[in-house]
């Protein structure tokens, strides 16, 4: 459990190797409240089977967003069209959906495929269907055409999902993002694995393997690096590692605690917890120069720092009030302000990308759940009903939270929308999974 005073010993052997996807997403709540959308299977214009069905990726993305609910393709009146010019509005008059996604895939040469995608405004088409013949282009919201390789099918499917999501909601899609997490495979000689994958668990890669525990991965703002804690030298040390080149640098190696690193919004500094002067306190360290600035100064434990988007303030967890609560500190003045009052404990907070809300772990009646606070009204909403929830990390578009929890006696990842309506579980095929961190936009 990510609570005050818990610091796991870390050690690692640096590795980089592909691995099979170990995560799947099981939607557990919220489908009925989602907006219906039609996704027509993309028309394959080649010989033999298609390398992959891009529309399957799009359907899964939209369903996992918690915002949309793709309707059963068997109920679609036209199931073999790829362009809006083939779209017959009258045939769609009884379909309860707000838009239609369609497209085609055509082989162009060795491992080269022309992918066409179009997004149609079904509501507009239905409203105008009774007004006589209309130009089909009137219904077209967006379209694109690109040549890609078979290896790029899944990524381009995520790109289409991003376009659809943004066009219909006004919010940038987060389907082309990654998550970092720790997998624990008990019984192995080096059971602790630091992994990264696409947001949906595909394209999983191992970055680190260790005989000792790993935790607290944190993404750099450009998505190229991870900060983490290691005990490989028999003491706590903070490292920053490039996920592409594997190059890494030791950032802090003070006596005692070196923990909970998190990148500043400009990527130049880390906020972290150090006990070099006695009690665990919040510090900020310059990654290049290693210059250190102490931020808090209190006899109680201060830990789990997180940045506001403007880089001028931090939130952190402290026991200075007698129990773990979340506080805000302004870096320029050092002024500290208590943020949370509801429940028994509040800890592990992070600020949403727009700076308007805070996601954190709330303990009430002995139960640890993920909660959201509106920073203007201070209204608190408990988002989850799972058990022993911890380590929340917010998607870069602010719509979803991934977190660690316990399911059937194992540590797993789960997700919840920031309005609490949509919930999903991300079980691992092998081992236990914890300490998730959602990447920035890539």
UniProtKB/Swiss-Prot annotation:
InterPro entries: 6-blade_b-propeller_TolB-like, PD40, Tol-Pal_TolB, TolB_N. One of its GO terms (biological process) is cell division. Pfam families: PD40, TolB_N. Keywords: Cell cycle, Cell division, Periplasm, Signal. GO terms for cellular component: periplasmic space. Residues 1-21 form the signal peptide. It is found in: Periplasm. The keyword Cell inner membrane does not apply. Belongs to the TolB family. Part of the Tol-Pal system, which plays a role in outer membrane invagination during cell division and is important for maintaining outer membrane integrity. The Tol-Pal system is composed of five core proteins: the inner membrane proteins TolA, TolQ and TolR, the periplasmic protein TolB and the outer membrane protein Pal. They form a network linking the inner and outer membranes and the peptidoglycan layer. This is Tol-Pal system protein TolB.
